Swiss-Prot record:
CDD domains: Peptidase_C1A (cd02248). It is an enzyme of class 3 (hydrolase). The active site is at 139, 278, 298. The keyword Iron-sulfur does not apply. It is found in: Lysosome; Secreted; Cytoplasmic vesicle, Phagosome. InterPro entries: Papain-like_cys_pep_sf, Pept_asp_AS, Pept_cys_AS, Pept_his_AS, Peptidase_C1A, Peptidase_C1A_C, Peptidase_C1A_papain-like, Prot_inhib_I29. The gene is CTSS. It holds the Pfam family Inhibitor_I29. It comes from Canis lupus familiaris (Dog). This is Cathepsin S. The keyword Secreted applies. It comes from the Eukaryota. It catalyses: Similar to cathepsin L, but with much less activity on Z-Phe-Arg-|-NHMec, and more activity on the Z-Val-Val-Arg-|-Xaa compound. Its EC number is 3.4.22.27.
Amino acid sequence: MKWLVGLLPLCSYAVAQVHKDPTLDHHWNLWKKTYSKQYKEENEEVARRLIWEKNLKFVMLHNLEHSMGMHSYDLGMNHLGDMTGEEVISLMGSLRVPSQWQRNVTYRSNSNQKLPDSVDWREKGCVTEVKYQGSCGACWAFSAVGALEAQLKLKTGKLVSLSAQNLVDCSTEKYGNKGCNGGFMTTAFQYIIDNNGIDSEASYPYKAMNGKCRYDSKKRAATCSKYTELPFGSEDALKEAVANKGPVSVAIDASHYSFFLYRSGVYYEPSCTQNVNHGVLVVGYGNLNGKDYWLVKNSWGLNFGDQGYIRMARNSGNHCGIASYPSYPEI
């Protein structure tokens, strides 16, 4: 795996310089069992254990502060608890905002429209199950297919998981995408338009690695006629699009420990920037305990966050860049 090379110096340092906390042995073993963690060498396990202990301390202190009303969300030691923030983004982020970005904003707002206070497209059967991208930076592909899956459901009444692997393998150099090394949602939509379709997940399953393009038009599950980009940084436009059109692909800054260890509540990270690095899907919005939020579907499996979802702060100055690059496809 990509992180192993960078981990080698850390392994040597960990064995030579740092000692594990023996009082955490039971909980370490329990956590490994819970998430089926296995390590090839003792040095690797020691290094992972030390990262895990550091993350555990971070989680415990954060949750203590949460109990005192200092945070609007709490954290948990999920399956990513033995990784650093840099590793998580290196493996699972890899968003590639196209260079010389030329925004083609075609969205027309209806500012006089009364929008619902809350929306959740899961309740309308327009959102497929949470996926797990593994150690492949295909977040952009999962965000793109998630948005198109909803449009397919709205048009045909059928909810079908579409193939992220189709995008990883086929939406490549011409579109500026690099498969597991990153891509972008609008260029994925453009590929589907040019290709006259995308296969289903069932016919073209996810492999979490780059492969040869195997698109089969006979197994085409959906098409895309165009896509729409929203105005940069406008949370009002994003809210309107989510309410009226369906789930929207967005890009966010997900590089913080607080993000990948999020468990519940409304995520607000003061150090979050608008330098986006991860593609996700906004499937709704609402208010929880007086905090406005975006309901976001991630692609890090069910063990991430709240069953694979995170509520991110809304109306907080384009927090984490969530309204910087929104787009949605149409069939």
